[in-house]
Amino acid sequence: MSPPAAIYEPTVAATGLKGKVVVSETAPVEGASQTKLLDHFGGKWDEFKFAPIRESQVSRAMTRRYFEDLDKYAESDVVIVGAGSCGLSTAYVLAKARPDLKIAIVEASVSPGGGAWLGGQLFSAMVMRRPAEVFLNELGVPYEEDANPNYVVVKHASLFTSTLMSKVLSFPNVKLFNATAVEDLITRPTENGNPQIAGVVVNWTLVTLHHDDHSCMDPNTINAPVIISTTGHDGPFGAFCAKRLVSMGSVDKLGGMRGLDMNSAEDAIVKNTREVTKGLIIGGMELSEIDGFNRMGPTFGAMVLSGVKAAEEALKVFDERQRECAE
C-alpha cells in the first residue's frame, strides 16, 4: 500500500499564490547520502567503461523476453484495450486486487498514457474534482488545494501519469504491449444472438496503419474472458470497440458524444461504466460514444474513477465469463 499523505503549508510563491499542498511521506532518511551516484561515478570518468557485450546478446535478451510474454499472455484473464488514464487506473486496481490474474494491456501508441501527460490546452497542470483525490492519495501523488474545496490540482500531469504507469508495470501479473493495435474482437455465439466477446485481434500499429497500401498482413490473437475497452473518444483508434459493436450489430448505433458539460459528464461516465455485452466492459470517454454523454474537457477525476468502476465490474463477472469461455 502506498504511504499515507501528509499536508504541509508551503511558503508564498513569487506569484503571490498560496495553497495547501498534499505530498506523500517519502522524504529522505535524515543523514543518508543524497549524492550516492556522484559519490560512485564522480571524478572517475577517465577510466570509465561499460561492461563488454556482443550485439547478438542484446537482440536475444529482448527477443527472448518478448516472445515469452507473447506466449504467456496469448491466453490472458483480462485484456485492457487502451493505456490512457482510465485503462491504467483499471489495471492498477485489478492487478492489486487479484494478483492471480494475468492482465494484458494493449496500447496502440509507442508511449502509453493517452492524453494524461498534459492538462487542458497543452498546459502542464491537471485538475481532478473530489473525491478523485482518494486515488491520488493511494498512489502517493502530491497535489495542491485551492480556496475552492471541490477540486485538487496536480502541478504536473506527467507526474501523475508516470507514477501510475510505474506502479502498474511493477505488478508481476501485468504485461504492456505498446505499439500494438486492436484490429478486431474475438467472438463466440450465444443463445440470444448477441456475440460474447472472448478476446482481441492484434497487430503492430505500424502494420495496422498500412493495410491499405500493402498486401495482406494477417494479425495475431489474445484470448481472454473479459475485455475492458478504454480507448477514448472517437478517433483513428479511439472508441474502437464501441464502433465495432455497431458494425457487428450488437449496438444499433452510437449515441455520439455531446457538447462539454463537466458536471453531468463526469458523474455519467463513472456511474455507467459497465459490461455492455458479455465479456466486454467499456469505460472512460469511449462510453460517451456509446451512450451519448457530454464531454468533460480538461478534468480527469472521471477517468480514474471510471477505471476503478471498470475493475469492480470485471471482478463481478470474471468467474462466470471464465467458465463460459473455457472451451
Curated annotation (Swiss-Prot):
Pfam families: Thi4. InterPro entries: FAD/NAD-bd_sf (IPR036188), Sti35 (IPR027495), Thi4_fam (IPR002922). Binds 1 Fe cation per subunit. GO terms for cellular component: cytosol; nucleus. Keywords: Cytoplasm, Iron, Metal-binding, NAD, Nucleus, Thiamine biosynthesis, Transferase. It comes from the Eukaryota. During the catalytic reaction, a sulfide is transferred from Cys-216 to a reaction intermediate, generating a dehydroalanine residue. Substrate binds at residues 86, 107-108, 115, 182, 218, 233, 285, 295-297. NCBIfam families: sulfide-dependent adenosine diphosphate thiazole synthase. Belongs to the THI4 family. Homooctamer. This is Thiamine thiazole synthase. The lineage of its organism: Eukaryota, Fungi, Dikarya, Ascomycota, Pezizomycotina.
